[in-house]
Amino acid sequence: MIILGLTGGIGSGKSLVASYFNRFVKAVVFDADNVVNNLYNFDNNVIELVKSYFPTSVNNGVVDKNDLKHYFLLYDDLWIKFQSELHSIVWKIQKDFILSNSRRVTKYVVLDVPLLIEANYHNCCDFVIHVKANSILQRQRLLKRGMSRHEFELISRLQLSDNDRKRLSDFTIRTGLSKNFVVSQVKDIVFQIDSRVGCKI
């Protein structure tokens, strides 16, 4: 089993790239954003964790994500402590996900994790792929999601620079030109990896 980690700025197209690995080489994808969403929605322990740090963000046992975002945008010591606890929960779920797939006939696992390198999730990867888009396209994508400029700038500050990501990665995929171009890069990376590990799909 080969573990691929995706790193890239917010709005760079990591989820698109992950979906193409799933489509073309049947990779199983660990989507950390989706995991966190499910934790906020359904995990009573995480809901209680949120409530213990940010009481106004839980109403009738439901996490108010808009209210929680307010605390994220403050990004103070309280948020950092909460985030550390949440990351440890996500890390365990990721480990269980990898272990579960290692027991199956799974060729590729793709980790679609924000702050992959910054939070040291890349340490369990065989290869790291840098997903890159130009800053104008990133902003356009995020505006469509309804993200504020302040939120975009905060998240950008928390992330490594593109130069650092590229230096710490094995491959780079550029998004934004066309979907066919992204697909060709995915297939080329699969070919290179298979050549290195001596196996074929």
UniProtKB/Swiss-Prot annotation:
Main enzyme class: transferase
Q: Which keywords are on file for this protein?
A: ATP-binding, Coenzyme A biosynthesis, Cytoplasm, Kinase, Nucleotide-binding, Transferase
Please state every residue range assigned to the domain named DPCK: 3-201
User: According to its UniProt record, in which pathway does this protein act?
Assistant: Cofactor biosynthesis; coenzyme A biosynthesis; CoA from (R)-pantothenate: step 5/5
Entry GO CC: cytoplasm
Question: In the Enzyme Commission scheme, what number(s) does this protein have?
Answer: 2.7.1.24
Function statement? Catalyzes the phosphorylation of the 3'-hydroxyl group of dephosphocoenzyme A to form coenzyme A.
Report the family membership: Belongs to the CoaE family.
| Record's protein name | Dephospho-CoA kinase
Record the organism: Ehrlichia ruminantium (strain Welgevonden)
